[in-house]
Structures are given as C-alpha cells and as structure tokens.
Amino acid sequence: MAVNGASSSGLIVSFGEMLIDFVPTVSGVSLAEAPGFLKAPGGAPANVAIAVTRLGGKSAFVGKLGDDEFGHMLAGILKTNGVQAEGINFDKGARTALAFVTLRADGEREFMFYRNPSADMLLTPAELNLDLIRSAKVFHYGSISLIVEPCRAAHMKAMEVAKEAGALLSYDPNLRLPLWPSAEEAKKQIKSIWDSADVIKVSDVELEFLTGSNKIDDESAMSLWHPNLKLLLVTLGEKGCNYYTKKFHGTVGGFHVKTVDTTGAGDSFVGALLTKIVDDQTILEDEARLKEVLRFSCACGAITTTKKGAIPALPTASEALTLLKGGA
C-alpha cells in the first residue's frame, strides 16, 4: 500500500485505558505551581484508535469508563472521531481515571494518577465484546491493563481471542512506573506477554528499563527479540526510530519540530504504522516500503508534539505528507 491518505479497510481494535489528562497551562512548573490545567482526553490505546481514524483508517476501542460525565465525554470523543464504540463498558461504581501531567520546559512529562480503582481497572472477561475483537485484523494493547485483576484477565482473554481469530498482535508497553507496585513487578508483567506479540514498539527509555542496559544499540534491542516477532521498533524521539525484523534492521531519521508536549507522540507513530500495514503485512518483509511507512509514522509522531494534549494534536495524512515534503 502506498504511503498516502488512502483509507484502509481492515479493522484495528485497540484495548485498554482511556482517561482525562490535566495538562498545566504553563510548561516548566510543578503541579503545585501550575496556575491552571487544560483538560485533555488521553490514554495510550484510545490515542492509537483515534490516530488511526484521523489518518483514514478503521478502528474500535475496547475498555471501561466510569458512568460519569468524564466517561461519557470520552466515549463521545471516540464516536466523534469515528472510532467504533461497541466495545466500551461503563462502571457505575468507579470513576473515570484522571492523570495530572507535569510538562517540563522541553515538553517531556511526569505523571500523577488518580485511579483507586478507576473504571478501566474493573473490566472483566465477561464484559468483552468478543465478536468485535474477532473482527480485528490488528489487535493493539499496552501493559497498564496488566497491573491488576480483573482487567488483567480481560486483557489476556481479549488477546487470546484476537490471536485465535488471526489478528496481528501489536504491543506498546507504554511504561508508567508510578502505576506499578514496583519496578520489578512492572518488568515481570510487561515481559509476561512479550512472546505473543507480532509487532512490538518500545521507546529508548523503555529499552533501557527492560534490558537493564544504558545502551541504545542493536545488541540491546535484539536481546528483546523473540522467534515469532515480525517487527521490533525502538523509538528515539526526534532522532526517529530503529527497526528490526528477521531479515534486516536499520534506522529511520526523525523530524526537527518545535516541541510543546510529547504526550501521544508514540501513539501517533503506532497508529500511523498500523494504518499502513493492516491491509498489507508484506510491508514488514520489504525494507524499502517499511522505511517509507516508518518515515510517515515518524512525521505523524513529530506533528503530535507541536500541540498540547494527545488527541487534539493527532495529525491527518495530509498534514503528515506536508511535513514529509518539507513544507512544515
């Protein structure tokens, strides 16, 4: 499939959490010092689902929200953005998750979460829309849904059903250490489902965390390889990404843009990649085409860093193509 704005037909189902990010109106201050906050919908799997539709693809979200104003607002945002919402459940007893995000002057973030428990943690296997999951050509997920039961059991069931139905499994661990009981538990659970994934994307920081090495090199990345993996990606921020397949590996350069907020950049990158490969997985075996797709994905990620919040900043295909052509 050419790298253009053409709509893909295969369904990408994204599983996990959706929440409200409260982002300070001023960068470079602590949460206590922030004069105010901008309310921004977020949650990595939901960001990916919207990134896909923004680029002309077809996506659905599976997860649980609070039966509260924020939860219904988030469901409305998914629908407004063309994401199929038949996989959403609402919990009457728990609130929608909130995250307060500290923005450093360089746009990097620190998080403080309010989920004790939040609705997303309470999704059960019985609440899953299995028909929707079976219809996925790509099933995408993170690791936050592995932290506690019953959501962990729902995650495992959904993954198993998608795999049995022939979906490509896409995994972005999206490490958020403050949510885990310990770093050791985070590493153990993130690795517990490692060998099921066909495509894995980690950031350079996550690579260091998972390998225990401070080197971002091929040897370190390949220590995460497993025999059934089709593509391993290590994102490097504005430097682009490294890619690894069974037959080849290399680097795709990034884009220099004025970074305001890095929230959602990785999700935008993943959404772009999945939109391009959902109908033609042979791209994963053709280095020239894969590099073209990854360059497009890097452009999408870069654009997402130029605005505050994730979902408002996710680009259209034409915006990404403008940056690719050097017009931005």
Curated annotation (Swiss-Prot):
GO molecular function: ATP binding; fructokinase activity
SUPFAM superfamilies: Ribokinase-like
PROSITE patterns, alphabetized: PFKB_KINASES_1 (PS00583), PFKB_KINASES_2 (PS00584)
Pathway of action: Glycan biosynthesis; starch biosynthesis
Domain of life where this protein originates: Eukaryota
Entry GO terms, CC: cytosol
InterPro entries: Carboh/pur_kinase_PfkB_CS, PfkB_Carbo_kinase, PfkB_dom, Ribo/fructo_kinase, Ribokinase-like
Catalytic activity: D-fructose + ATP = D-fructose 6-phosphate + ADP + H(+)
Record's keyword annotation contains Transmembrane: no
Membrane-spanning intervals of the chain: none
GO biological process: fructose metabolic process; starch biosynthetic process
UniProt keyword annotations, A-Z: ATP-binding, Carbohydrate metabolism, Kinase, Nucleotide-binding, Transferase
EC number: 2.7.1.4
Enzyme kind, highest EC tier: transferase
Family note: Belongs to the carbohydrate kinase PfkB family.
Role description: May play an important role in maintaining the flux of carbon towards starch formation.
Protein name, as recorded: Fructokinase-2
Lineage, highest ranks first: Eukaryota, Viridiplantae, Streptophyta, Embryophyta, Tracheophyta
